[in-house]
Amino acid sequence: MALAISHEDTQILLKDKNILQESVLNKYRTAGQIAQTALKYVTSLINDSYHSKTTQRQLTVPELCLLTDSFILTRLEQYYKNKVNERGIAIPTTIDIDQISGGWCPEIDDTQNLLNWNKGKDSTFASSVTGTLRPGDLVKITLGVHIDGYTSEVSHTMVIYPVDETKPILQPTGPLLGGKADAVAAAHIAMETVVALLACALTPEKLPASLGGTSSGITGQLIRTIVDTIARSYNCGVVPGSRVRRIRRFLAGQNEGIVAEREYKGVVWTESHQEADLLSNTDAKDLTVVDRGQSTPFTNVSAIPSDDFVVQSGEVYLIDLKMASLEHCTKKGLVTLETVDSYTGKSHKAGELIARPGAYVRDFAQTHILKLKTSRQLLTKIDKQGVYPFKLSHLSSNFPFVHENEEELQSLKKDLKSFRLGMSEISNNYLCVESPIQIARWVPWDHILKATNPNGNLSYDATSTLTLPGHELPLPKLGVSAIKLKSLMNSTKESISLPVARECNTIVLCDSSVSTTDRPELLRLTGGSKTCQPSWIHSQHELNPQDSIVQGIFQLATLAKDKRFGLLLKETQPMKQKSVETSNGGVEETMKM
């Protein structure tokens, strides 16, 4: 978890290389432009396959992920060639459907395996298992690009609509309704509000008085309060793992839980915050609360996320928000995450998903002498990928795809079979860690509070590898460990999975020395009106204008629209499209700046 690094190297890696100057900003901007273009590319593939239906067949989720990753790598070849040591995919393209919160990026050879593993299951995860999207699905697209370690990530939620084929121009039959619409609305409004709020760090005098004025700047506590207020207004819960955090060179949150990052600066939503909210509002006097705060083994407290920070100019922030609808939750409960595994035959529980992760992260703190030649060769390829997550298909000589054809697919599947053999020994010796597939779950509080917990926090979930420092216990006040919480999820029929909407943007707070104008500005590397327009939805909920926090949210929205006296917001535009040719599921596309 901790590596010995000299003070001089620490100064270079964490300070000098993260000073926002023109060369650094250009790398961020180029990475953002490629990410924006890739998002537009994959959404156009989905629209062509499922809405306009101009393709000969519908592209499946594994194919969409593979084509998008290939597109990103092809675009990267045009920039900073022989000028930087590292550039590539920061996050393999994931396409999470409905209840899946993150991590769904199956390999191209897993299509039949998913069908076999989930044979006889109900239709809760039918779209994910078959790889074919259905009307009403919430599709969360996540991808990322880095150039020389400067990272731009983006996530966007789009809706698959039923299409009215009786009209000459295919159109959706109507807006999305219900709990899924609530989650989409909450995620979009929260994203736009937080972007405007962070822009106030450049001009503190414009921060609305109802949000604290210029008293202490933009703090982590203020960010949390605003996001929680929006979530409650739309009957949603903030999914654990959501975060608004500062990112730095090679430190974009891609390996949280593997590397204890010094001077961590950001707001992170976990189960413990829901627990604190429950205990602060309870009237019960006989509830035993145990303080487990001193049990953390980490001595470097700066690596533990805390809301006690102030946003400053010259910083880069990742805003990653996930909202889960509580439409079918009849009482108070805990929104948590369940990790999917590939172990079959362990139960016949309804609504269960069996799958194996598609992405891995290299843990450079671990060393081991591998026995298999295949494993050693594979590890050599993995080490060239750097510190970012990767898929086994990225290591194949057939990647990236220029054209999709049967011969290349068969060659790739042959490579994957060999890679899986080597990866088995590598992961068993902890040289690589799987990026988990996680499902949003709801568990009633009364079931948690009534359960016996004789071991307290002594039990430890060894499979929970990607855990932030200081958050090893999901419910520290109640002394409930991760392994106990996992058993509680499976021991009640009241526990249900929740649909999730996700929005993720990367922004830069530019001071006047690097801005395109003489004024400080917020540069939106990813997201915005060109690539992340909200889908057609209708929610029955709305913000309460009598709430002082909501009044501040409305004022931030007004400032964001005021081009003259409001906040100065700029968006990175995707590359312009010259030509697109689609045939037999293969896609060729050329771009220009």
Curated annotation (Swiss-Prot):
Protein's cellular compartments: Cytoplasm; Nucleus
Keyword Acetylation: no
Species the sequence originates in: Saccharomyces cerevisiae (strain ATCC 204508 / S288c)
Gene Ontology terms, MF aspect: metal ion binding; metallopeptidase activity
Lineage top rank: taxon: Eukaryota
Database matches in InterPro entries: Creatinase/aminopeptidase-like (IPR036005), PA2G4/ARX1 (IPR047113), WH-like_DNA-bd_sf (IPR036388)
Swiss-Prot/TrEMBL keywords: Cytoplasm, Hydrolase, Metal-binding, Metalloprotease, Nucleus, Protease
Gene: ARX1
Family: Belongs to the peptidase M24 family.
Protein name: Probable metalloprotease ARX1
Residues in the signal sequence: none
Top EC category: hydrolase
EC number: 3.-.-.-
